[in-house]
């Protein structure tokens, strides 16, 4: 993952992915980006690869390709990798592999409709426009609770809570429960609280999310 999502929104250091690309190219290793989370606007671009200006050899994507409405995944590959599968004898099957629901017409229709909505409603641009406000609000929480780190990029961010002496994850569970009771949903992994608002979010909705999270943190 160019930005590790489920692990806690781990943003790579400046130059890390570029150096990884150089090493993979030098040693003939395929660079594969898992963009199931970061793809389709989460970072304000089609893919994180564009945000970081790094061209991988393959991209795995899903979720945002249909906005999660219908299950669908895809793999984007470099042209010469594609050609390696297509240059076999005409009578041969280049890749004897497939899934029962590959190319499912309903999933494909949902994907095409989703891509149209992204473009027509300017949702990637909306994510870019909201990013500074998202960043300001999440870092404004630094004195609201015992935090050890705050990370963000695009419309995703995370707060690392100082572990409760009584046991790991207890503080995060408390924040999750209080946020839920107040009508908000946050992701909890260990002592990390993650936030990934939808691309259609408006500034006032972003404020409501952070106001609710601030109240949940106040209960620690």
Model-derived regions: residue spans:
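Conserved N-terminal phosphate-binding loop of PLP-dependent enzymes in the Aspartate aminotransferase
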Residues: 1-220
